[in-house]
Amino acid sequence: MTSTVWILISILLATVGAVVGFFVRKSIAEAKINGAANEARRILDGANRDAEALKKEALLEAKDEIHTLRTEAELEIRDRRSELQKQENRLMQKEENLDRKDETLDKREQQLEKKEESLVARQQQIEELESKVGELVQKQQTELERISNLTREQAKAIILGKVESEVSHEIAVMVKESEVRAKEEADKKAKEILSLAMQRCAADHVAETTVSVVNLPNDEMKGRIIGREGRNIRTLETLTGIDLIIDDTPEAVILSGFDPIRRETARIALDKLVQDGRIHPARIEEMVEKSRREVDEYIREVGEQTTFEVGVHGLHPDLIKILGRLKYRTSYGQNVLKHSMEVAYLTGLMAAELGEDEKLARRAGLLHDIGKAIDHEVEGSHVEIGVELATKYKEHPVVINSIASHHGDTEPTSIIAVLVAAADALSAARPGARSETLENYIRRLEKLEEISESYEGVEKSFAIQAGREVRILVKPDTIDDLEAHRLARDIRKRIENELDYPGHIKVTVIRETRAVEYAK
């Protein structure tokens, strides 16, 4: 019973609690709904206020934009009106100018009409005068024909003949004067070019040498060089082809030979043997072979250095080595390599003055004597060998022709070939260039003066300009003007018959008459 009551009470309390909870939750929900509605109304009111503010702001901006556009439009309209006004003013000014020009043209047209009328009148007068002059000329021609018994055609032919003769003579005189002037100018220009080239090219004096000297540390070394029964010296002479001269010269051995390459090989080998101290046939063979290789390498270096100094590039390596061999070749005492470099410089300078290819000219000058490097090993003249080498190594045709023609064996086909021949003559013929040439030079001067002074009436003679000219002073009371010309011809013939000389020699006979009186 008691438990039932408590159960009922519990159920009742639970029911009451549920009802009370329902109403409490309902009141809370209604309160929240009312708060949310109030908040929504507040937010809506704020949004309306913001929208109204934005609307007002947009209206203000629109009004400002409209005001700005209106102001700009007014300014643009004002500018356009101003521009239109200026154009209108310019058009009015042009119209006024055209009106003035129209008036000026009308005035000029009137003036031209007046001048035309005047010209027509003068033309009529001229025609009348020409008619009268024609009649007078016809009358005069008729009268002249009657007086001279010649027709008009005959008189015309006579006059034309005289004019033609006079004109032909004048033309001949002018042509002769032009030829003389051209020759003088050409000679002058050639002398200027040659003198300029020679002044800009410095050359050394040379002397031929056929011996080399090897210094020894002491005279005892001479016996070691000779060896037992002379076997060392015989081996060295056999391998090098050079004669060793061991005499009383203190601490020196002389190497004699005409082949400079062999002589240089022997000198280097002997110098190495002396420094090494071991001198016997096997060691000599080793040193000679080593010296040959050193000389070959040095020859190649000399060839490369020469092409660099002269400014010639692109030569075949074999041709460079052959060029280096020229250092050990001489011609009448003149080193052929130095001579070739000198010719290259001179040819290049003259070619530059004439507007020719300076590099090609230097190349032709450098290679003009290339055949002399091996002319003692190959049959043929150095010109033929040089042409073969240049052709073999595909040198320029101008270079080949320059080699072939520099001694006059063939005709030169280019200006550069002529310049190479001239430079070769300049380098070889100058005093001091070649030892034999120096002796011949002095002998030629003496012979020139001897021939000149052998004639009667010659007072004194002078060989000048390195033997290129001889001036002869004659006695004026013995030799007259005609005799002076004859004397010059006779001396010229004797020089041609008795002397050998390059180029030509100018013979000048000077006859001077002086009248001197003294006032007391």
Curated annotation (Swiss-Prot):
Residue spans crossing the bilayer: 4-24
SMART domains: HDc (SM00471), KH (SM00322)
Predominant location category: membrane
Region (Disordered) location: 86-111
GO biological process, one term: mRNA catabolic process
Compartmental location: Cell membrane
Record membrane topology: Single-pass membrane protein
Keywords annotated in UniProt: Cell membrane, Endonuclease, Hydrolase, Membrane, Nuclease, RNA-binding, Transmembrane, Transmembrane helix
InterPro entries: HD/PDEase_dom, HD_domain, HDIG_dom, KH_dom, KH_dom_type_1, KH_dom_type_1_sf, Ribonuclease_Y, RNase_Y_N
Gene3D superfamilies with a match to the protein in the record: Hypothetical protein af1432, K Homology domain, type 1
Molecular function GO labels: RNA binding; RNA endonuclease activity
Gene from which the chain derives: rny
Entry protein name: Ribonuclease Y
Lineage: Bacteria, Bacillati, Bacillota, Bacilli, Bacillales
SUPFAM superfamilies membership: Eukaryotic type KH-domain (KH-domain type I), HD-domain/PDEase-like
Domain KH: 210-273
E.C. code: 3.1.-.-
Family according to the record: Belongs to the RNase Y family.
Gene Ontology terms: cellular component: plasma membrane
Function per UniProt: Endoribonuclease that initiates mRNA decay.
Location of the HD domain: 336-429
